[in-house]
Amino acid sequence: MVETIRFIPFDKIIFYENYKGDRLETLINNMGDKKILINPPVAVQIQSNQYLILRGKYRAMALSKLRCMNITAQIVDEQCIKISSWLHQLPKNNELIMRFQENRDFYFSEKKLAHHKYMVKMYIEDKIYYLYNDIKGDIGEVIPLLNSIMEKYDKNYKYKKIIKEEYTSNSNYITLEFPKFSMQEIITLVNKGMLFPENIVRYIFNVEMLQNLMIPINVIRSPEAFEFEWREILDKLLKSV
């Protein structure tokens, strides 16, 4: 596991999803006060000099804001990654349901359409509905549609993020299930300058993840000057495995 930890130049990393400024600011202040990074972000190498951050985007961004030219990251092999999606569950609200049904940004259907990828599978009581991007199926239309869907409830209604295995039918809730995207689809969208809304894509790692690893910010900021301290951190990690 030690060999999976690397220093990566911040200008060599890219992100796949958007972020909230207030949450980032809170983390910057917290990390700045404690002067510690708890657990490095997780990334996958997608080109010889480019890495996609899969988990820990706020930590990666905060390190940059704290004057770190490089970030520490746990690098995982693409073969060890399974891509799924999150479900959003929120209290049933008839006004919200009408917003979905009457919105012209997408096609609302009670039937699953053959050869078309739905953008949301919606569970309302014992019925299932599907939202499509106007039947076109263009990958470039995915992000605007997902943003349009989440704008209907993200700020005004509190939702709970759950996994598929946790879902049970409940007449008091609306549950939205997002589709799965391949790594290639995600990279294609990112290369077009598009970012997913938060809490859509879910990564499952079939590899041991670093837990409770604490790295001083000054070591990350100046690894050459603190080479001895960095070696101590790696030695402790190696002994704990």
Residue ranges, per PLM feature:
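Phosphate- and divalent-cation-binding pockets in alpha/beta enzyme and binding domains
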Residues: 61-62, 185
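Solvent-exposed functional surfaces
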Residues: 69-71, 75-241
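Long, contiguous hydrophobic alpha-helical segments, chiefly transmembrane helices and signal peptides
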Residues: 53-54, 186
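Active-site-adjacent beta-strand anchor residues
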Residues: 52-53, 176
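Helix N-cap/beta->alpha junction signal
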Residues: 55-56, 179
